[in-house]
């Protein structure tokens, strides 16, 4: 039997989380708002002053090259400057985007996947992408509520996150160091933490969310391919 406080918590949770069909009806992703992907990219650049400056420099250099292409000395200087400015722009974009990959953002994405259990290509990914866009904007992590252009990019990001964290964990697994010390160390002195292999992350909290989300996604992919090829009877 639930206590009054538990009933209140359930009601509050229900109020805080609208029903799925209402969320789906109000979901508008950047692909629905912008005419094209390039107009979306230009909008994102225009909303961020550092990126805007780094973007305008190559544009100005291209214009200067068209005006001074007959003067060899100036042309060489401008071309070198253009190449360097493009490299700086790419580094700036990479650094700017990588700032969003903090623990809070990753756990929020994993919680969305665990809660909604999205099917492969399912509408749940639209809701997840929308919620993540709002989360990043509301917390000041991203300058617009348009981080994920569409649900497919959100899904692709999630899969790359699982793959990347898994490979990083294998490279930094404590068992690598433990194997080198076990020959000179009694078995009783080797702690359980020392020989425990990490599947995704050495952070136990992040590890738990990653494992659960990966299991849900694996089940969704298995179900998707089972429906695609029903004649193959898999266990």
From Swiss-Prot:
From which domain of life does this come?
A: Eukaryota
Does the record carry Nucleus as a key word?
yes
Report where the covalent cross-link Glycyl lysine isopeptide (Lys-Gly) (interchain with G-Cter in ubiquitin) sits.
11, 218
Spell out the subcellular localization from the entry.
Answer: Nucleus membrane; Cell membrane
Describe the outcome of a gene knockout. Answer: No sensitivity to killer toxin K28, a protein-toxin encoded by the M28 virus that uses S.cerevisiae as a host. Cells lacking all 10 proteins of the DUP240 multigene family show no obvious alterations in mating, sporulation and cell growth.
Note down the stretches annotated as region Disordered. 169-189
Looking at the UniProt entry, the stretches that span the membrane are 51-71, 73-93
Report one GO cellular component: plasma membrane
Q: Which UniProt keywords apply?
A: Cell membrane, Isopeptide bond, Membrane, Nucleus, Transmembrane, Transmembrane helix, Ubl conjugation
Membrane topology type: Multi-pass membrane protein
Q: Where is the composition biased (Polar residues)?
A: 169-186
Q: Which Pfam families match?
A: DUP (PF00674)
Also noted in the record is: Present with 1695 molecules/cell in log phase SD medium.
Tell me the subunit arrangement: Interacts with ULP1.
What's this protein's family per the entry?
Belongs to the DUP/COS family.
State what this protein does.
Answer: Does not confer resistance to killer toxin K28, a protein-toxin encoded by the M28 virus that uses S.cerevisiae as a host.
User: What name has this protein been given in UniProt?
Assistant: ULP1-interacting protein 3
Q: What organism is listed for this UniProt entry? A: Saccharomyces cerevisiae (strain ATCC 204508 / S288c) (Baker's yeast)
Q: Which gene encodes it?
A: UIP3
């Amino acid at each position: 039997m639930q206590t009054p406080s538990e009933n209140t918590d359930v009601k509050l949770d229900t109020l805080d989380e609208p029903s799925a069909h209402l969320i789906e009806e109000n979901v508008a992703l950047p692909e629905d708002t912008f005419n094209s992907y390039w107009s979306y990219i230009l909008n994102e650049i225009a909303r961020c002053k550092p990126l805007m400056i780094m973007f305008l420099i190559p544009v100005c250099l291209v214009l200067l090259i068209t005006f001074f292409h007959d003067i060899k000395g100036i042309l060489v200087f401008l071309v070198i400057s253009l190449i360097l400015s493009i490299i700086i722009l790419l580094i700036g974009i990479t650094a700017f985007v990588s700032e969003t990959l903090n623990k809070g953002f990753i756990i929020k994405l994993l919680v969305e996947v665990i809660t909604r259990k999205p099917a492969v290509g399912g509408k749940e990914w639209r809701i997840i992408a929308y919620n993540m866009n709002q989360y990043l904007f509301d917390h000041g992590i991203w300058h617009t509520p348009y981080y994920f252009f569409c649900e497919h990019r959100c899904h692709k990001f999630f899969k790359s996150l699982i793959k990347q964290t898994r490979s990083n964990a294998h490279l930094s697994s404590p068992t690598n160091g433990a194997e080198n010390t076990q020959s000179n160390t009694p078995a009783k002195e080797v702690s359980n933490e020392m020989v425990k292999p990490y599947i995704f992350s050495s952070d136990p909290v992040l590890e738990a969310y990653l494992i659960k989300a990966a299991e849900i996604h694996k089940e969704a992919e298995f179900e998707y391919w089972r429906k695609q090829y029903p004649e193959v009877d898999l266990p």
